[in-house]
């Protein structure tokens, strides 16, 4: 490590030998090496002389030829430095990096030099660079903020030796180049023009400047002496002004005392006037409140009489009673200040209101209770003898009750207990009528559907058990079972009649249920979750009412304020309406489900019709929260389960299918799937539930494909390839006919499997009719593979021309045709007539035979060219053989 003395010596040497001659000054130097085993070099920060100093970074190296001689290798402007990396903020670190036109990595021999160099470099960059300045990384902040880190590094040891250099550094660093102003430049130019001789005689110029300076000093002294008298006179004027200001201030103080007394007097007068005005305002407000209370709590005598003895049977009596009840409701819910409620007169009046309310409410309750029971009994005694499939309309009941709607609204607002009791009486009275009508309606619907299937209604519930015991336990339409094992089925016309009647049943239910629901909402004011009035309680229960109101307010407001309370209110209203409708139509859903299930037991395909039809009504409902929509939706859930159960049974029947000894090549589930798919497409073609059916299509077809692969190996008589070929062909034709987009991939798979099975069957059963010829040329190919040329094969003893002619002589045209006839008979036995694939297979065998023939002819021409050797038949003969055999059968 270099000592401090050595550092100073290097700096002095470089300044003297390199920079002094060019007028430059060395600000800082650091001894560095690129690698530890190389010679050191010096990084220097150098500046030119004022007035416009230019600071540069130089790399100095020592000459190898001459000891003590230094050369400048590179120079960079400070704005070329992009960043400086100290590598580590520890003082003992020697490494640092400079990013110039490339990255330079240096190792400083002395950390003090490194510290001083980085500090000086940062200070000069901050002073000289006007644009983007270099970034200093991993350098202690103290180094960058100290004014003179070089002094701190060198210490007192070098103060004596470098005292003169430091003073020069400080003086030159403190110098700032300042340009002359225009005024200074003009005056300097004027001075030089007046003293033109100064260029020739500097001493004369200095003497003239001295004389002018002496004259200016004298003028300044005279000006100071002259201004002294003026200053004394000004001080005298200031003393006079101060005395006058004191007098004026004393006068203002006396005025302020007088105004203070006036202010206190006016404040007292203003306070008295304010109290008088407040008293007058209070009297006016009190009079208004009293008039308001009297007008709000006043009930005319005629209305009091109408409440005591109401006449609810006549229109005029009802009108008067309703008007009196509404006035009473308005008076009891009037907006009165809570303090006024404590007045004895107010409490007495509200007690009288409470008595009138209870008496009138009891009268209304008794009258409406009797009216509900009377209407229910009157309609219940009527005999229903209609044979048409219609649900009776009870709009006459609604017309009878409509005039009493406002009384029910008043009862809900003023006496909730009575209101709930009347609602229960109405539900009990009308529910008996609707139960009777709904049961009769569904019984009549069952009779109309089954009138051609059975002779009496008693057979309806026992139909399934009687059919199973008499004929079969296997439901009609089961895919995995042969048709001759199915139980009795239902004709398509019967299914269509059931679908039409189901639509009529659902259409009849909708207007009746909707009419009753709308009437109940209006009559019982069910679209309002709570009374619209503010208070129905007397002053005796005021404190309890206040607590209840606060709890309602706190519970009704959502913390997030996002409209949740309104949703909660709507949900509560819908719940109350459904509860009332459930009480009126309690048997509707069980009867509907029973009606559907009774026919599903007769024919499982009915579940498909119900699934589609019920979905249409649920999706087309305008009010999805209505009672009937919810009832249909609940029934639809059960129908969907029945539908899934039916499809699951079909899928299970395919997987568990068993073949009998006399089974045909077409598997039962493949044959049955055609009728099943056509029926399902007729039902689901334009339905919103088509996606559900397509999902089951995928499962069923995949199960059928798996079954074909499995059961083709178990077939007792027919070859595996034939079973697969015919069944895949049948499925491909059916899927192409259905044109279901979701089954396109399976249709392509069916076609591929069919072609693979056809190819495998032709390969296995057609084989090679010219077997010995094929074996002969297999030996030829073996010799060629061993290196014998094709043109020299005839010289081999085993493959000579004579041997070839002997083999060809074994296949005359007559024998070949006879072999093909036997093959045709075998194929005819294998294939079934339903699929009509005999000609397709026969044509494929013809193509295979022609391919083998062409191969043999090609081998003969290549290996025995010019020998005039040919088969006894040609391609035209082959075509004739196949055509004659096909026509003869």
From Swiss-Prot:
The modification Phosphoserine is found at residues 145, 148, 456. GO terms for molecular function: phosphatidylinositol-4,5-bisphosphate binding. Transmembrane segments: none annotated. Pfam families: Sec3-PIP2_bind (PF15277), Sec3_C-term (PF20654), Sec3_CC (PF09763). Keywords: Coiled coil, Exocytosis, Phosphoprotein, Protein transport, Transport. SMART domains: Sec3-PIP2_bind. Residues 156-269 form a coiled coil. InterPro entries: Sec3-PIP2_bind, Sec3_C, Sec3_CC. GO terms for biological process: exocytosis; Golgi to plasma membrane transport; protein transport. The keyword Coiled coil applies. GO terms for cellular component: exocyst; plasma membrane. PANTHER family: EXOCYST COMPLEX COMPONENT 1 ISOFORM X1, SEC3/SYNTAXIN-RELATED. Belongs to the SEC3 family. Component of the exocyst complex involved in the docking of exocytic vesicles with fusion sites on the plasma membrane. The exocyst complex is composed of Sec3/Exoc1, Sec5/Exoc2, Sec6/Exoc3, Sec8/Exoc4, Sec10/Exoc5, Sec15/Exoc6, Exo70/Exoc7 and Exo84/Exoc8. This is Exocyst complex component 1. It comes from Drosophila melanogaster (Fruit fly). The gene is Sec3.
């Amino acid at each position: 490590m270099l000592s401090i003395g050595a550092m100073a010596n290097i700096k002095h040497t470089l300044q003297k030998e390199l920079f002094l001659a060019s007028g430059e000054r060395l600000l800082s130097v650091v001894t560095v090496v690129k690698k530890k085993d190389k010679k050191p070099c010096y990084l220097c920060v150098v500046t030119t002389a004022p007035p416009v100093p230019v600071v540069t970074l130089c790399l100095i190296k020592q000459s190898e030829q001459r000891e003590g001689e230094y050369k400048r290798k590179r120079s960079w402007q400070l704005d070329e430095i992009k960043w400086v990396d100290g590598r580590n903020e520890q003082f003992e670190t020697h490494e640092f990096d400079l990013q110039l036109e490339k990255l330079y990595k240096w190792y400083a021999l002395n950390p003090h030099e490194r510290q001083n160099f980085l500090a000086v470099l940062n200070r000069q960059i901050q002073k000289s660079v006007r644009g983007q300045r270099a970034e200093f990384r991993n350098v202690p902040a103290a180094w960058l903020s100290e004014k003179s880190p070089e002094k701190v590094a060198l210490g007192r040891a070098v103060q004596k030796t470098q005292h003169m250099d430091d003073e020069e550094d400080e003086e030159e660093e403190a110098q700032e180049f300042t340009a002359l102003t225009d005024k200074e430049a003009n005056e300097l130019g004027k001075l030089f023009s007046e003293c033109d001789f100064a260029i020739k005689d500097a001493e004369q110029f200095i003497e003239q400047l001295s004389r002018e300076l002496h004259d200016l000093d004298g003028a300044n002294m005279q000006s100071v002496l002259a201004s002294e008298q003026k200053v004394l006179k000004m001080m005298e004027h200031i003393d006079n002004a101060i005395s006058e200001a004191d007098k004026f201030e004393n006068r203002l103080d006396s005025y302020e005392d007088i105004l203070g007394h006036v202010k206190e007097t006016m404040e007292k007068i203003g306070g008295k006037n304010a109290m008088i005005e407040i008293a007058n305002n209070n009297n006016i407000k009190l009079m208004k409140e009293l008039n308001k209370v009297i007008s709000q709590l006043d009930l005319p005598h005629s209305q009091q009489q109408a409440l005591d003895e109401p006449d609810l049977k006549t229109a005029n009596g009802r009108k008067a009673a309703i008007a009196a009840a509404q006035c009473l409701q308005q008076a009891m819910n009037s907006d009165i200040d809570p303090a006024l409620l404590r007045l004895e007169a107010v409490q007495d009046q509200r007690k009288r209101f409470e008595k009138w309310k209870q008496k009138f409410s009891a009268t209304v309750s008794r009258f409406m209770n009797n009216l509900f029971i009377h209407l229910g009994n009157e309609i219940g005694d009527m005999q229903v003898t209609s044979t048409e499939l219609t649900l009776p309309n009870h709009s006459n009941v609604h017309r009878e009750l409509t005039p009493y709607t406002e009384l029910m609204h008043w009862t809900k607002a003023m006496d909730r207990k009575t209101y709930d009791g009347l609602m229960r009486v109405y539900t009990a009275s009308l529910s008996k009528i609707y139960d009777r009508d709904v049961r009769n309606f569904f019984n009549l619907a069952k009779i109309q559907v089954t009138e051609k299937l059975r002779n009496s209604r008693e057979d309806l519930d026992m139909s399934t058990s009687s059919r199973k015991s008499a004929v079969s336990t296997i439901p009609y339409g089961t895919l995995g079972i042969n048709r001759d094992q199915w139980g009795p089925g239902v004709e398509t016309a019967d299914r269509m009649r059931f679908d039409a009647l189901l639509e009529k049943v659902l259409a009849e239910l909708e207007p009746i249920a909707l009419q009753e629901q709308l009437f109940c909402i209006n009559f019982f004011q069910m679209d309002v979750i709570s009374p619209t009035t503010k208070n129905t309680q007397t002053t005796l229960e005021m404190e309890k009412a206040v607590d209840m109101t606060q709890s309602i307010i706190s519970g009704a407001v959502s913390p997030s304020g996002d409209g949740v309370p309104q949703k909660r209110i709507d949900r509560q209203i819908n719940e109350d309406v459904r509860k009332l409708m459930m009480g009126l139509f309690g048997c509707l859903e069980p009867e509907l489900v029973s009606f559907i299930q009774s026919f599903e037991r007769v024919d499982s395909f009915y579940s498909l019709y119900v699934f589609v039809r019920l979905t249409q009504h649920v999706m087309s409902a305008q009010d999805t929260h209505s009672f009937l929509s919810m009832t249909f939706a609940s029934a639809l859930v059960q129908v969907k389960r029945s539908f899934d159960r039916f499809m699951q049974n079909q899928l299970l029947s395919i997987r568990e299918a068993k073949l009998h000894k006399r089974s045909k090549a077409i598997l039962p589930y493949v044959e049955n799937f055609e009728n099943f798919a056509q029926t399902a497409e007729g039902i689901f073609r334009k339905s919103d539930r088509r996606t559900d059916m397509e999902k089951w299509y995928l499962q069923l077809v995949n199960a059928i494909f798996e079954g074909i692969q499995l059961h083709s190996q178990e077939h007792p008589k027919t070859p595996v390839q034939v079973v697969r070929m015919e069944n895949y062909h049948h499925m491909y034709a059916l899927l192409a006919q259905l044109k279901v987009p979701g089954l396109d991939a399976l249709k392509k798979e069916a076609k591929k499997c069919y072609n693979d099975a056809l190819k495998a069957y032709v390969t296995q059963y057609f084989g090679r009719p010219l077997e010995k010829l094929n074996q002969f040329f297999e030996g030829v190919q073996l010799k060629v593979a061993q290196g014998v040329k094709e043109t020299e094969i005839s010289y081999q003893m085993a493959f000579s021309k004579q041997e070839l002619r002997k083999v060809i002589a074994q296949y005359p045209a007559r024998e070949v045709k006879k072999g093909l006839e036997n093959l045709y008979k075998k194929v005819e036995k294998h294939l079934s007539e339903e699929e009509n694939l005999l000609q397709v297979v026969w044509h494929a065998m013809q193509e295979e035979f022609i391919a083998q023939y062409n191969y043999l002819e090609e081998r003969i021409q290549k290996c025995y060219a010019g020998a005039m050797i040919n088969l006894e038949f040609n391609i035209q003969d082959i075509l004739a053989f196949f055509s004659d055999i096909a026509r003869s059968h």
